[in-house]
A protein has these predicted regions:
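Conserved P-loop
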Residues: 1-79
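Conserved nucleotide-binding/hydrolysis micro-motifs of P-loop NTPases
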Residues: 36-39, 68-73, 98-100, 142-146, ...
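Short amphipathic alpha-helical segments
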Residues: 44-45, 104-106, 149-150
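Conserved acidic residues
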Residues: 60, 90, 158, 162
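Phosphate-binding/switch region of NTP-binding enzymes
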Residues: 116, 123, 127-195
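Phosphate-binding/switch loop-helix module in NTP-utilizing enzymes
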Residues: 65-131
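Conserved, well-folded catalytic cores of nucleic-acid-processing
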Residues: 7, 22-26, 47-54, 80-83, ...
């Protein structure tokens, strides 16, 4: 499980859609769980055309699901293996992991419940990833910590993902920094996606 977090417009959704597209292009099935309504099939087709890939059937191996609540999001992961459309997915993308949790359980008064539910959700995903050899790509928003920006979900997310990458927008480029190690790469945004 890998988390990509950053401010709005830092390239999280772009990266998530491109990962699903690359999985599809490689002959794998992907499940794209959209919590914010940001999935755009026409953008995927544009990336494929710009890269010289055919678009026929390319989106047939990307299963799209929109979730509007934390319970719906959690239930989808719990039942994924038993459903024909999703059990063969080798990549699961959740864009954005914490959105439904912060919407359903807002404010400091709900922090313990929110973090507990998020912990259960992440633990179930980690178990599914291990048992079914499935990769998870999670996008996340940021909040301001005592010193710098941190991904929403804090230690709960940090402890259960295998890697976290902070994305920062720099003009038409995006810098990805591995947290906490600090190594980074700079990639360009364009018609063909992130290069």
């Amino acid at each position: 499980m890998v988390e990509f977090f950053g401010r709005s417009n830092s390239g999280k959704t772009q990266l998530a859609m491109q990962a699903a597209l690359c999985a599809s292009r490689s002959g794998f099935r992907a499940l794209f769980v959209d919590t914010e309504g940001s999935f755009r099939p026409e953008r995927l087709e544009g990336i494929a055309r710009a890269r010289g890939w055919g678009t026929a059937g390319l989106l047939d191996t990307i299963v799209y699901v929109r979730t509007d609540s934390a319970s719906e999001q959690m239930e989808l992961i719990r039942r994924m293996q038993g459903r024909e459309a999703t059990k063969e997915c080798q990549l699961v993308v959740i864009d954005t992991l914490t959105r439904n949790f912060t919407t359903d359980m807002p404010g400091r008064q709900n922090l313990a419940g929110r973090q507990g539910a998020l912990n259960v959700h992440l633990s179930e995903m980690a178990r599914d990833a291990y048992i079914n050899a499935r990769a998870y790509l999670l996008t996340n928003r940021v909040t301001f910590g005592p010193v710098h920006e941190v991904g929403i979900g804090g230690r709960t997310v940090e402890q259960l993902v295998h890697a976290s990458v902070r994305l920062d927008r720099e003009g038409h480029s995006v810098r990805g920094t591995l947290v906490p190690e600090g190594g980074s790469i700079l990639a360009e945004f364009g018609e063909s996606g992130i290069d």
